[in-house]
């Protein structure tokens, strides 16, 4: 695909279990020329996670200092325990270099980003699973989740779905058809960067 003269940031949004993470993994394999910025977090690495692949692990003190310095494009404190955020500089540099930048965010993160960057630089793609029972099954396939956590995720999914129209595009994610989701994202990128 052709690189645009000025880059674009494609934010992939959707509830837990929608397939957005799996789609991004596939896009990374298929498009090594795209930029996939990592998030910073204060949580400890989980088993199998490596520094710099999905997250950069930093201390709460460092994270708070970077908030004060205005280094984050968007950030959030999750469960009053850990911070997560996306640094501005790598994204701004990639956009200035004409790169396609892809990042997964939640709906609140998307809203923060579109209030910060020029709107024409950002494209929102919402990955939708219409059936919440299907969504629940997908989440449970990953492993056991306590009932209260599942209830929280389902409530969050309903809230995100109710706000999906703030994104430029909505893609349906049928079970077992991640290739269709990836192809739809590629088609959107092609259209938006032509």
Where are these regions (language model features)?
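ATP-dependent small-molecule kinase phosphotransfer cores
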Residues: 41-101, 107
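Walker A/P-loop
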Residues: 21
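P-loop (Walker A) phosphate-binding loop of NTP-binding proteins
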Residues: 13-15
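Conserved phosphate-donor/acceptor-positioning beta-strand/loop module used by diverse small-molecule
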Residues: 101-107, 117-141
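NTP-dependent small-molecule kinase module
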Residues: 3-4, 140, 144-145, 159-194
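Post-Walker A helix-loop "phosphate-sensing" segment adjacent to the P-loop in P-loop NTPases
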Residues: 29-37
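ATP-binding Walker
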Residues: 18
